[in-house]
Each structure stands twice: as structure tokens, then as C-alpha cells.
């Protein structure tokens, strides 16, 4: 983490930097040092032509962040949400602050894999829902579905290249 933050704070400020913490909850367990790094990053990154991003499975994970969660929410100009059943609870727990109309839009967000995933976007320019649709090959390259990954890995273990395994998945499941 030192190398990452050093790169942000000491590098040429004309170069943009994006620091992403995927499954962010795991970084915030008992390590108060890492909490401080993330909190400082969310407060200062803009000054260095950088930004911090966290990815979690649920908006409710923000509770695990403690006070850092407030800093993250208050310093995040852009928020993106995929389909979830946690939105009402997050609203009740003050992890979100949307009016009834916006909540209806947020809760309407759906995923229809492998065809598309809808994404609710809360930006300085407004809120709304967009669709991410990818071609079938790209879908299987980036899938996080355990059964699909298992099927691809089984083909690879059987001597098929990843590319051919993915092409086979596309043929098998094309609808």
C-alpha cells in the first residue's frame, strides 16, 4: 500500500491515478493504518489528480468501515449500484439518503445475465440507470459466476486453451 500511495502523492501530477480496492471490506478489519490510508486518500487524492474507488458486494458493507465509511460516502462524487435487495435496509440505516422517487429508480435496477446488467448511477450530473451489455465472448472472459468459471476451468484442465474454452461456452449457451 505504501508503494501505491507513494506513487499517487509523489508522482507527476499531470498523470491521472486511480486506486481501486475490490472487496474493500477485507482491507478494513483490524488494520487502523489501512483505514487511515483510505481515509486520507478519499480526502486528498483529488489534489494529486487521483481518485480512490472501493468495490463491495453490498452497500451494507459500509457499516464495516466505521467512521471511514462516512468519509468515503461524503467524498465520493460518483456512486454506482448494481441490483441488490439491501437498498431499503441501507436507507433505514442512513447509509443512503435518497427520496422515494429515486429509491424506486434504484430498486428497479436489474441484471439479466449474460445479456446485460443495469447500473444505477449517482453523479454530480444527476442520477439514472444505464445498461452494460457486452458481447458473449467478453461476458465469459469476465464472468464471476462460480458455475461458469468451474465449467471453463474443467475444459482448461482437460487440455483446452482458455480462448477455446470461452468460445465453447459462447457456442453452448448462445441464446
Map each language-model feature to its residues:
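Conserved P-loop NTPase motor module
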Residues: 2-10, 108-175
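Conserved P-loop NTPase motor cores
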Residues: 1-104
Amino acid at each position: 500500500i505504501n508503494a501505491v500511495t507513494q506513487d499517487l502523492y509523489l508522482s507527476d501530477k499531470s498523470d491521472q491515478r486511480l486506486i481501486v480496492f475490490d472487496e474493500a471490506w477485507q482491507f478494513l478489519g483490524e488494520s487502523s493504518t489501512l483505514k487511515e490510508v483510505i481515509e486520507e486518500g478519499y480526502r486528498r487524492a483529488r489534489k494529486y489528480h487521483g481518485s480512490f474507488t472501493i468495490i463491495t458486494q453490498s452497500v451494507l458493507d459500509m457499516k464495516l468501515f466505521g467512521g471511514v465509511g462516512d468519509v468515503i460516502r461524503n467524498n465520493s462524487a460518483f456512486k454506482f449500484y448494481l441490483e441488490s435487495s439491501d437498498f431499503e435496509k441501507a436507507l433505514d440505516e442512513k447509509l443512503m439518503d435518497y427520496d422515494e422517487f429515486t429509491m424506486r429508480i434504484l430498486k428497479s435496477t436489474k441484471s439479466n445475465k449474460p445479456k446485460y446488467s443495469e447500473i444505477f448511477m449517482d453523479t454530480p450530473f444527476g442520477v439514472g440507470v444505464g445498461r452494460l451489455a457486452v458481447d458473449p465472448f467478453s461476458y465469459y472472459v469476465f464472468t464471476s459466476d462460480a458455475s461458469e468459471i468451474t465449467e471453463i476451468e474443467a475444459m482448461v484442465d482437460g487440455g483446452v486453451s482458455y480462448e477455446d474454452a470461452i468460445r465453447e461456452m459462447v457456442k453452448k449457451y448462445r441464446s
